[in-house]
A protein has these predicted regions:
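Gly/Ser/Thr-rich phosphate-binding loop
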Residues: 187, 272, 294-302, 311-385, ...
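Conserved AMP-binding A3 loop
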Residues: 69-71, 201, 209-233
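Conserved C-terminal "lid"/linker of ANL adenylate-forming enzymes
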Residues: 501-508, 516-520, 531-610
């Protein structure tokens, strides 16, 4: 029987009911807004032009000492659009854009939108076969390549089969010297008109605007088709429902603009509100609060790893009385949620869930803690066997839905409102669809994520959910399921650890997968194996304790700060493939020891006793 509430608890509950009700009333009009039909004439470019007409003289962007108003930004964008059109780019053409975060990235991408062309937003850290693959899988007619990343591009330039006139070099902050085999795009852009293009008004919501690529942590990146409708479906709620953004806000934007969170959610919120942004090339934990104070940023677009990096920094004067009020992003884990919110006095943490290619979206619109929020999509959670890595079915072959509080594989129904636009590769698109799930003929998008419904208290009767794990990021050891995220959260709290990347590895003559963690240590730390061993014993059950520990000088992440596991999993504890220190917890041992060649051979022989 539940204990009766005391007076203080009753008052807190009443305050929460009042707060949630006010929040709900405030966002109801925007929740009711439906995405445009695919035939409606609306696009990123037309939304930009509407914002410019309303906020023309207001500041739009601050970048490395340079400031532009909305009107000035639009004029530069129009000049780029006229220049690209003169070079033969037309509606439906794909153009690869490879640059760091900077003003020219935005003006060229929006210039392509003005024409009705497709901008392929390519990870600027890629090189070699992955870079070549992304350019070619997008069907790129031209490439806009920044001076700062041209060396990587030059290495694969001969394999692209493009004429010199199709390689447009974009200077970075100075005139520079255009390399042989390309043309200097900015050399004569100023000669073109600053007027809007007349054809922009004819671009439809269902037209493809962008290609945004998957991270490629387990293989070659896939190009997700982002229509104008899909961009609107992400950008509008980010600003209106999530951040409650207004023209007087200033955003801190340091996420890569080639990624959906930065370009769809961040820029979408800015365009729909008329707010300004402080744009940074890359995130810096040590300079974040100095920037926030100098530029008085009120909103921040995050991924969870950035929040963890900020918490790992020593307390500084600049974080005190900081101007940040609201944050929007994904991947903020429950173990640091309240610490992040409390230490930095954040009023509103709006976690969201979604993917560039998917049709499922969640948003924490009611500002609840430790949740990715609610959804308007039709979703179900079905049983998933993490050991066999497959969906569980009943005797009739039907999927089994899980109960509240139980993790399940998240599926989103594909219908007219919540479309699945897929990838450029039709086979890859079909592989993400499950059919005949509830009734014959239905189709559902397989997110590949384990999610569970949770209790968040009073929430207007709306179901709320929490991210649990990525399928494949859960493994089985000692007949128990081990969540890499849960173990990682616990290890991240260790005094030595900057970031823990947990994964499962095969061990000869052992059932399941043994846990392994790759640790990057805090600055100035030398790995204290005794302290870490004691911490693991104290905080993790035996089956969840990593068997192997690898010490890395720097965490392995993608350009969008996602932990890279594929190569680490492949290298595992194999001494010939790893130059860094590896430690092992022997069976029935109570402390980690350095893995030497003799014990390594014992493991390979299957006689170590695991």
């Amino acid at each position: 029987m539940a204990k009766p509430l005391n007076g203080k608890q009753i008052m807190l509950n009443i305050k929460e009911i009042v707060r949630v009700t006010k929040d709900f009333i405030r966002i109801v009009p925007d929740l009711a807004v439906k995405p445009p039909s695919v035939e409606e004439p609306i696009s990123l470019a037309s939304i930009l032009e509407a914002t410019v007409s309303e906020h023309s003289d207001r500041n739009m962007i601050i970048f490395e000492g340079r400031e532009l108003s909305w009107d000035e930004f639009n004029a530069l964008t129009n000049q780029c659009a006229h220049a690209l059109f003169a070079r033969g780019i037309s509606r439906g053409d794909a153009v690869a854009v490879i640059m760091e975060n900077r003003i020219e990235f935005l003006t060229t991408v929006f210039a392509l939108q003005k024409i009705g062309a497709i901008a392929g937003l390519i990870n600027n850290s890629l090189a070699g076969p992955q870079l070549q693959h992304c350019i070619q899988v997008a069907g790129s007619k031209m490439c806009l390549v920044g001076e700062e990343v041209y060396d990587n591009f030059a290495a694969i330039r001969p394999q692209l089969g493009l004429a010199d006139s199709a390689i447009l070099w974009v200077a970075d902050g100075s005139e520079g010297v255009c390399p042989e085999g390309s043309e200097n795009f900015l050399s004569n852009v100023a000669e073109y008109p600053t007027t809007n293009l007349p054809d922009t008004a004819t671009i439809l919501a269902g037209d493809t605007a962008l290609y945004i690529f998957t991270s490629g942590t387990t293989g070659m990146p896939k190009a997700a088709k982002i229509t104008h409708r899909r961009w609107i479906s992400g950008g509008y709620p980010a600003g209106k429902v999530g951040l409650l953004a207004k023209p007087t806000d200033r955003f801190y934007l340091c996420l890569p603009l080639f990624h959906g969170t930065g370009f769809i959610c961040g820029l979408g919120a800015i365009l729909y509100s008329g707010a300004s942004m402080f744009l940074r090339r890359k995130f810096s934990a040590s300079e974040f609060w100095l920037d926030a104070q100098q530029y008085q940023t009120t909103c921040f677009i995050y991924v969870g790893e950035l929040c963890r990096y900020l918490l790992a920094q020593p307390v500084c004067d600049a974080e005190m009385n900081n101007p940040l009020e609201r944050v929007f992003g994904n991947g903020l884990r429950p173990d640091i949620w309240l610490q992040f919110k409390g230490r930095f006095a954040i009023d509103r943490v709006c976690e969201f869930y979604g993917s560039s290619e998917g049709n499922v979206g969640f948003v924490n619109a009611l500002n609840k803690d430790k949740t990715m929020g609610m959804t308007a999509s039709t979703v179900i959670l079905v049983q998933y066997d993490v050991d066999s890595d497959e969906i569980v079915r009943d005797a009739q072959g039907k999927m089994i839905q899980v109960k509240k509080g139980t993790p399940g594989l998240l599926l989103g129904e594909i219908d007219e409102r919540f479309k699945f636009d897929g990838y450029t590769n039709s086979e890859a698109s079909e592989a993400k669809i499950l059919r005949d799930v509830i009734k014959p003929g239905d189709a559902w998008f397989n997110t590949g994520d384990l999610v569970m419904q949770i209790d968040v208290g009073f929430a207007m009767g709306l179901k709320h959910y929490q991210f649990v794990d990525r399928v494949g990021d859960t493994f089985r050891w000692r007949s128990e399921n081990v969540s890499t995220n849960e173990v990682g959260e616990i290890l991240n709290a260790n005094v030595q650890v900057e970031l823990a990347n947990v994964f499962g590895v095969d061990v000869p003559a052992a059932e399941g997968k043994a846990g392994m963690v790759s640790l990057s240590l805090k600055a100035g730390r030398v790995f204290d194996v005794e302290e870490f061993s004691a911490y693991v014993r104290q905080h993790l059950p035996s089956f969840a304790q990593p068997v192997f520990v690898r010490i890395q000088s720097e965490a392995s992440t993608t350009g969008t700060f996602k932990l890279v596991k594929g190569e680490l999993r492949k290298q595992a504890y194999h001494l010939p493939e790893v130059s860094e220190d590896i430690y092992v917890m022997p069976p029935r041992g109570d402390a980690y020891q350095r893995l030497d060649e003799a014990y390594y051979q014992t493991i390979l022989a299957g006689t170590a006793g695991f």
